[in-house]
């Protein structure tokens, strides 16, 4: 049996992300925005996970292109709705990551507002980013407990109901749900 290890990536998205970065480096921000929009369309259908940085990368391009309001509108009407569209059908851990990604978008919006010296927007987006980070942390803990409860059922089948017969390391792992 051969096991192949390697890094799986989406070549098309990777090339689009690099192209957008190159356009931005040349200060061609409108083209960078167009390329990033295409990259995002491909990210949504890719079987590869992308970092929050890749998802939110488009936001600063709007500000640098002198299109601050367009960036806010793009985030509000497209980017954030796209990120949260599966929220209600997701488990706690997936919901946590949705919150993380939305929080990163808000961080970029806050940075744009800071650069534009729009204090009210900066405060608003910073607060939203903090809310999303808090939700991420809480949902990750809920997801951890849910996973433990699932695994606990398997441990019951292996070790039985008498916790005195369970190994100490296993008991320690399940402390959070045995209380």
Regions found by a protein language model. Give the residues of each.
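Alpha-helical junction/boundary sensor with strong preference for TPR arrays
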Residues: 36, 42-46, 75-86, 113, ...
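Short, charge-rich amphipathic alpha-helical segments embedded
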Residues: 30, 34-64, 82-90
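Generic helix N-cap/helix-start motif at coil->alpha-helix transitions
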Residues: 8-18, 48-55, 95-98, 102, ...
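Alpha-helical segment of the N-proximal tetratricopeptide repeat
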Residues: 7-38
């Amino acid at each position: 049996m051969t096991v192949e290890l390697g890094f799986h990536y989406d070549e098309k998205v990777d090339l689009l992300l690099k192209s957008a970065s190159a356009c931005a480096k040349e200060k061609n921000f409108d083209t960078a925005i167009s390329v990033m929009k295409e990259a995002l369309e491909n990210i949504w259908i890719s079987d590869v996970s992308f970092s929050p940085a890749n998802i939110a990368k488009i936001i600063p391009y709007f500000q640098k292109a002198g299109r601050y309001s367009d960036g806010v509108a793009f985030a509000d009407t497209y980017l954030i709705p796209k990120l949260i569209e599966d929220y209600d059908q997701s488990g706690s851990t997936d919901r946590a990551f949705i919150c993380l990604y939305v929080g990163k978008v808000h961080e970029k919006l806050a940075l744009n507002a800071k650069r534009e010296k729009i204090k009210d927007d900066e405060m608003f987006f910073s607060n939203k980013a903090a809310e999303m980070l808090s939700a991420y942390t809480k949902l990750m803990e809920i997801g951890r407990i849910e996973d433990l409860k699932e695994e606990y059922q398997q441990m019951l089948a292996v070790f039985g109901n008498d916790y005195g017969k369970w190994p100490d390391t296993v008991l320690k792992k399940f402390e959070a749900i045995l209380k």
